[in-house]
């Protein structure tokens, strides 16, 4: 989400020159997994990333690229999937996608149609592996069961909402992932910046202007504050930043393969990479976790193309 033309929803994104600089530094630091979507920046995120890779990456095998499909007029119909993969490949200037993720569950088309179409992409070598995002456990199990029944490619990863102040995935999803031999690439691992600073610190543009993230976290700020205070305590104790501690916590979880973290400043990228110098003790982790109380589940119900929840009284 950090790359692409500025939009009303995400006005803080990086232009092409800034994208080049950010990706160049990321590659220098050893980062090789990049996540985007056909809808980010109205498609320009894929374009900017593709342009940067063309200039900076000598061997395509040195990077792992994930992109997503769902937000289009056909959602996850076979026709829409076949059309959208061609658009993503063109914008990214690539012959294949390493990890192709369905961005949401499609309540309007049979999962059999979706999984068959995705399997055809794998067979045609336009996609190497399949992932999913923002799904309930029953949906993931249904999708993989359908694929298994027909001998089709299954999902190997899920990109769900998970961080130190939102741990509802620990109820059922993580146990299912263990059984399915899948991994997580959690989105919002830093809770849109809420676990990177104390509430009275300077507020970033995203914290104040991102309506979706305000709805996700603002209602729970009172029950989250004690945890955020403990993050600050641990950070001060081990001479780290709060962001590093929060990311170290999520990286301590065995099924987390790669948290999805976005940056708008190279200094943020460099600081976060220092997380690999940090190791939280078992006592630190227990101290950070023991105050957690159940949260209202961020819904993943049927949504319209303009991303409005059909249950407006819930948070999206």
Protein language model regions, located:
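N-terminal binding-site loop/beta-alpha segment at the start of enzyme catalytic domains
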Residues: 1-63, 95, 123, 191
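Active-site-proximal loop/turn and secondary-structure-junction residues that shape catalytic pockets
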Residues: 2, 38-40, 69-73, 103-106, ...
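Conserved beta-strand positions
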Residues: 36, 67, 99-102, 132, ...
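Terminal-tail/helix-coil boundary detector
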Residues: 179, 203-237, 252-256, 266, ...
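Aromatic-lined glycan-binding groove of carbohydrate-active enzymes
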Residues: 168-206, 241
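Short, well-ordered coil/turn segments that N-cap beta-strands
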Residues: 30-32, 59-63, 94-98, 124-128, ...
């Amino acid at each position: 989400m950090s790359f692409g033309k500025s939009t009303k929803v995400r006005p803080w994104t990086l232009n092409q020159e800034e994208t080049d600089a950010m990706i160049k530094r990321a590659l220098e630091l050893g980062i090789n997994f990049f996540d985007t979507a056909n809808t980010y920046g109205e498609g320009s995120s894929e374009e900017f990333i593709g342009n940067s890779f063309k200039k900076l990456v000598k061997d395509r095998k040195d990077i792992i690229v994930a992109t997503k499909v769902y937000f289009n007029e056909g959602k996850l119909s076979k026709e829409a999937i076949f059309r959208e993969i061609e658009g993503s490949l063109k914008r990214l200037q690539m012959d294949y996608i390493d990890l192709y993720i369905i961005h949401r569950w499609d309540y309007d088309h049979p999962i059999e149609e979706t999984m068959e179409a995705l399997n055809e992409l794998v067979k045609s070598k336009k996609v190497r592996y399949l992932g999913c995002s923002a799904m309930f456990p029953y949906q993931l199990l249904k999708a993989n069961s359908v694929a298994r029944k027909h001998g089709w490619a299954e999902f190997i990863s899920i990109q769900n909402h998970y961080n130190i102040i939102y741990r509802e995935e620990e109820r059922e999803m993580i146990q299912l992932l263990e059984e399915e031999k899948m991994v997580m690439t959690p989105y919002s691992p830093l809770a849109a910046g809420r676990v990177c600073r104390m509430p009275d610190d300077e507020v970033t543009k995203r914290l104040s202007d991102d309506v979706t993230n305000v709805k996700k976290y603002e209602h729970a700020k009172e029950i989250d504050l004690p945890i955020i205070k403990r993050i600050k305590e641990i950070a001060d104790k081990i001479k780290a930043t709060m962001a590093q501690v929060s990311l170290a916590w999520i990286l301590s979880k065995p099924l987390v393969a790669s948290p999805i973290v976005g940056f708008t400043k190279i200094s943020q990228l460099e600081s976060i990479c220092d997380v690999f110098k940090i190791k939280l003790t078992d006592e630190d982790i227990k101290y950070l976790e023991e105050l957690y109380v159940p949260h209202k589940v961020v819904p993943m119900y049927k949504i319209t193309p303009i991303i409005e929840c059909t249950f407006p009284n819930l948070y999206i």
